[in-house]
Design a protein with these regions (language model features):
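Short, Lys/Arg-rich, polar N-terminal cytosolic tail immediately upstream
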Residues: 1-11
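A structural signal for multi-pass alpha-helical bundles of membrane permease subunits
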Residues: 9-273
């Protein structure tokens, strides 16, 4: 009798588990598994987005991508952007977070936190439009200031040698506040007694930072680097609004390259590949 009751109870538990996991599994299949399968299927065919006729081309789309010099440049651009964005963002985030954590002026801290976090919640398109005007070669605000100071105009977005750096600086300005909050949260977990012991030993602040603070918050720094790297590989809005991949593909990144092939050149097969 007990075995039958136990068996019935186990069945109910299994059914409950299946019923609980089923909605999440269905959503995962619909929004993740199916799109991936369809992308692989679509990459084997040629044809435009508006045409129902598709021609099977096998691996030709993959060959076109692999031998496309623009694709190679796009990969290099994406890696350069990721390294610059993650590096600058993390250095600034750590410096600002350590300064705010050590400062005793609460009102100033609150004001600084609000100022650096506000750009993060603003639409990326809005930020891109504003900076596109600020960096405009002839009538942009930044170049107007440089001209007023008797300096030459700076080609922020109009030169292949400066466009990528300008784009990185805009993205760092927008995103650094979020990473500052993450690093500050990690700094709050460091026991104050460790710093007190370091002060009693007259340990220099720089040595305290590198020997105590940095190792204690290293897991959070690693996490933020991963998050920032993922975000940098997904950049699209700023490129689309500010540069459209130019000049001369100097800011063309992976996501924008895929978008351009699918919607500008009308070749979704290559985009899926």
């Amino acid at each position: 009798m007990k075995k039958k009751e136990r068996s019935a109870s186990e069945k109910r538990d299994r059914l409950l588990g299946v019923a609980t996991a089923a909605p999440a599994a269905i959503l995962l299949c619909v929004f993740t598994v199916y799109p991936v399968i369809y992308l692989i299927y679509r990459s084997l065919y040629s044809g435009s987005l508006i045409s129902l006729e598709k021609e099977f081309v096998g691996l030709d789309n993959y060959k076109e991508i692999l031998f496309d010099e623009t694709f190679h440049k796009v990969l290099v651009n994406t890696i350069i952007y990721t390294v610059l964005f993650v590096g600058l963002t993390m250095v600034l985030a750590i410096i600002i977070a350590v300064w705010l954590n050590s400062s005793r002026q609460k009102k100033l801290n609150n004001m600084v936190e609000a100022c650096i976090f506000t750009p993060h919640v603003i639409s990326m398109v809005s930020v891109s439009i504003v900076f596109l005007w600020l960096m405009e070669p002839d009538t942009g605000f930044f170049n107007m200031v440089l001209t007023a100071l008797g300096m030459d105009k700076f080609p922020f977005l109009s030169s292949p040698s400066t466009a990528m750096l300008s784009l990185v600086l805009v993205m760092v300005w927008k995103s650094v506040g979020y990473y500052v909050l993450l690093v500050m949260a990690a700094l709050k977990t460091v026991p104050a007694s460790i710093y007190e012991a370091a002060e009693l030993d007259n340990t220099p602040k720089i040595r305290t930072f590198f020997k105590i603070t940095l190792p204690m918050i290293s897991p959070t720094i690693l996490f933020t680097c991963v998050v920032a790297s993922i975000a940098s590989f997904r950049i699209f809005d700023a490129v689309n609004v500010m540069t459209q991949g130019g000049p001369v593909d100097s800011t063309n990144t992976l996501v924008y390259y895929i978008y351009a092939y699918a919607f500008r050149y009308g070749n979704p097969g290559v985009a899926c590949a």
